[in-house]
Structure formats: C-alpha cells, structure tokens
Amino acid sequence: GDVDAAFATADVIHEATYSTHRGQHAHLETHGSIAWVDEHGRLNIRTSSQSPFICRDKIAYLFGLGLPDVRVFCERMGGGFGGKQEVLTEDLVALAAMDTGRPVQWEFTREEQFIGSTYRHPMKVSVKLGATKEGVLTAMQLRIVSNTGAYGNHGGETLYHACSECIGLYRSPNKKIDAFAVYTNTVPSGAIRGYGLTQTVYAVESALDELARALEIDPFELRQKNVVRPGDPMLSLGEEISDAEIGSYGLDECVDLVRAALARGNGVNPPDGEDWLVGSGIAYAMHDAAPPTEHRSNASIELLEDGTYQLVSGTAEFGNGTTTQHIQIAATTLGATANRFHIIQSDTDRTGYDTGAFASTGTFVAGKAVALAAEALRARILGFAAQVMDVEPGMCRMDNDGVICGEGRISLAGLWLASREHGVQLGLSRKAYGSPRSVAFNVHGFHLAVNRVSGEIQILQSVHAADAGTVINPMQLRGQVEGAVAQGVGWALYERIVLDDTGKIVNPAFRNYRIPAYADIPRTEIYFADTHDTIGPLGAKGMGECPINPVAPALANALADATGIRFRDMPFRPDLIYKPIYEKFGAGVA
C-alpha cells in the first residue's frame, strides 16, 4: 500500500514512540554442562540445552569434529524460556575435557548468569496509525530499533518476528515497517519468551488504546473493527506468500470471555483511601505456532516385549510439559493409558533429529511427529492383529493392553511375540515440519489501582483468554499462562537491568534485580476458547510463548486509564512513574 497517501487522507493520526528494556530469563536453574571423552575418543556433553542437535552441530564445527564424534544429550534441565538455545558453557567444557582428558563440569553462578548470558532485546518502537473517524485503520507504520548488544545473537531473527504478528493481527490496506538491529557495547541480547514480538505488541497495543481514546471509541470496539478474520491473508514480510494460516479462530470468544470477566469484577477491592486511582486495560496478541523456517522433528514409537511402548523424541523437556503431552498424544491415538509408555528424549545418539524446543514447537511440531508415528503404528498393529486373528481389519479395535478382533482378543505382549514369529516390525518413525503454521490468539485484561502519592501499583483483577485449539492438558496449559503472566508482570512492573557508563551490569543478582515474588503475582482467571485447529496435532496449537505478549500493554493501558497519563517507557516502577503522577495529582502530596 501507500502509507503516505493514507496518512494524508486519514481523519485522525496517532504517532508516538514506546521503549522497552532488557529482561533476564531468571530461571532458577542456571546454564550448566558436563563434558568427557569416552574410551572410543568421542566427545560427550550432558547439558542444559533446549536444542541438543544444534548444539552438537556447533560444537562439531567449532572443534573440527565429525558429527558422529560428538554426542549431546539433556536430562531435565529446569527453566529455559529461550535462553538455553545459546551455546554458553558447552564449548568451554568441551575444550577443557579434550585438553585434559578428564571430565569437566561448569555451572554458571547467578552472577555469571547475569553477565554471561543473554537478555530480551531493548527496543524503541515508533508507531504511526491512521484511521477514519469511525475507527477503521487506514495505515499502520512502525520504525523499530532493536539493541542486539555486542553480538548478534538472534538479532535478525528476533527483529523479523517483531515485525510480523504485531500488525498482522489487524486489517489495514497500507502497512510499512522500517526495522534495524544495532550493535552496542553492552551485554548481548538473545532469545527469550515472545522473541521480539513482546516488545512490538506492547507498542502497537498501547498506540491502539491511545487512538481509541482520541476517537472516543471503546478500546475493545476499536480492535474488533480491525482484527483479522478467517479467510484474510496473513502478513508476509518478504516476496513469498506467508505459510501461516488461521487454523482455528477463537479470538472473538477470547474477547467475550475477558470482557465478561472484567465486567463481573471478581478481583480484590481497591485499597481504602482517596489516594488510589483505579483503571482497566486490555490488549490482544496473535502469535505464529512455529518460526518461519524449516523447523522439523522426528518421533518413533515401538511396541515392546512386555506390551508397553517406547516413545522416542528428539525434543527437550525444560518444564514446558512436552514429556507429558507427547505421551498423552500417543496414548490417545493408541487407546492406551499413559503408564504404558517409556520415553527417551533429547539425545543425539538415541533419538531422531529435532531442531529444538523453542518457538512453541514442542506440541505443534514435535507433538505432530508423535501423532503421525502413533497413527501409523496403530494402523500397522490393527492390520497385523487382523492377520493373526484371521479376521477383517475393520473388525479390530485397540484397548489399553490388547487388540479386540470380533469375538477374539490378543494381548499386546502376545502380539509382540507373534510379530517376532512373522518378521513384522511393530515400531515406526515419522517426521513433522513447522510449515504450514497456524496462529494462536491471546487476550489479557487488568483492573488495577495506582497510588497517586507513591506510584505503587496494585493489580486488582487479572484475566487471560487463549485460543490454543484443542487443550491437550488443561492443567499444564494453565501453568504456562500463569507463568507467562508472572513474567510479563515482572518485566512491566519490577525488573530493570542497570548499566554503568562502560556498559557493565551493576546489578547482577536477585537481591538488586527485582523479580516478582509470590505475593506480587495476582490470581489470574484463565479461559480457553473452544476451537479445533486444522493443522496442529489432535487440533492443538502451541501456547508456550504467546500468553506473555499482551500482559505488559494491558498493564500500560490500565495505568493510563487510572491516571490519565500515558507512560510509554517501561518498566512502570514507582520511582520511574511517580513524577508525572505527582505533577498531575500533586496537591496534598508531601
């Protein structure tokens, strides 16, 4: 489109710049690796990596080794949030192990975690919106400057993602983005939950609220006039057609759920006293279910001698719940209970290739590989059981520990034994890819109170609705949303990295890098849209990253609603927002 012409004829234009700051992953478990050279001369690394195969490839390249000469594997590693994609400890323990011939272990201290790992990219995002007086968007223009630090860790990829869904969520015939990733003499930025989109969603959703107030239109109504609908083309940042699709559309239901919950007002009451100002805010977000690259995953399932199954997946488990979900997917398809499965994961020697556990692909891509393998194995088991029992395949059905064929039945252990006698392999592998990609939707709403004397913010009500397609494990998904809200609240209200004049971090510890404690996090009402995705496994979509994206802008919009002041620079700490509040409500303030 032609944004200049659209702005020239717009009834109203809103233009402002919003800035975001660094955020640490703050996972309790720091980066750590153990390396040793075995009796065959192979380099072995046990590590806390979200991407063991990528780590293996990088280590092999770095030291001039063949891929078969390097094994990388992971056990349960604790939190990652994107940061454990980086090779930060593996290279040095490998060097030391090969040099000394002895096993070497290195685990970051908390200070090393702060100064030696990566952060969320600080960004300055200038947003210009044009609209008719009825609130229909006619032009959207962004200028993004992303601080990638001293090295370009994920600089280009994060910037690419930052540019897409933030404005792809809204219809407008004219869109333009100028985006820059710049090097600075500061700690490197890298991958972290949201992957650039969190920053730009904050800017766009804040700008939309400002536009709504300028037009005197309800913020919900302005968004509803302009959001994408099923059948709309997805925004493509290049010449090619986007492979993203709306596999299910639960945005309207998410909006209705959040709007109704805020209207009910099931939160806590505002504190007593005239110094507390109360406001509400909302924000939307859309997030692709996989990155726009060839993400792929292998999975295999085999029937074992005792009638149990062995499930093998290359993806890593770091608290994202893939172990449980993959077993659930396989168990559902094979008509079995979860305790019939043994799982092997994230080992470059023992599993098929997996690009990595990042970008919400644990369910959408790796889970799809599991589903395909389970479906293929089910078909083979039923066909072989029909052959053994001498019945038509359509007469057979699976249950937890056997196959029922008409009036007869054969146990899974018996079927395994028969497979040995007939030379039939009851184990299959399948691959899945991250294209085409579906999109997930999230809506968040807050009621909050801000003290006009101190600038203190208290969250009175927190509501989140998500379109995750089929919810495979509701408890785990609620945990993902609750964790995302906690991180979003921390990033927006508490956390702040301070650099000295040389770019050195001066607060590399939790005692002076404030993350939210249990008492700081509100109880969040969580709702799921009732949809079935046409692309994901069993109708599911990824929902690991998405819930964090609307949290900060919803807080910013609620703060503006309460005070009548628009704070565009994060974080919204009392010491940083007090002055404008004092200038507006200063009467009677000491």
Task: Identify the function of each model-found stretch.
Residues 1-465, 523, 527, 555-556, ...:
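Structural alpha/beta core scaffold segments of enzyme domains
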Residues 15-16, 223-224, 445-502, 507, ...:
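N-terminal amphipathic, basic-rich helices that act as targeting or association modules
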Residues 293-296, 471-475, 536-540:
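Short conserved micro-motifs at the rims of enzyme active sites and ligand-binding pockets
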Residues 342-345, 516-540:
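Generic long, charged, amphipathic alpha-helical segments
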Residues 356-358, 362, 535-544:
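Short, conserved non-catalytic motifs in the polymerase core
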Residues 537-556, 560:
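C-terminal structured "cap/appendage" subdomains that terminate the fold
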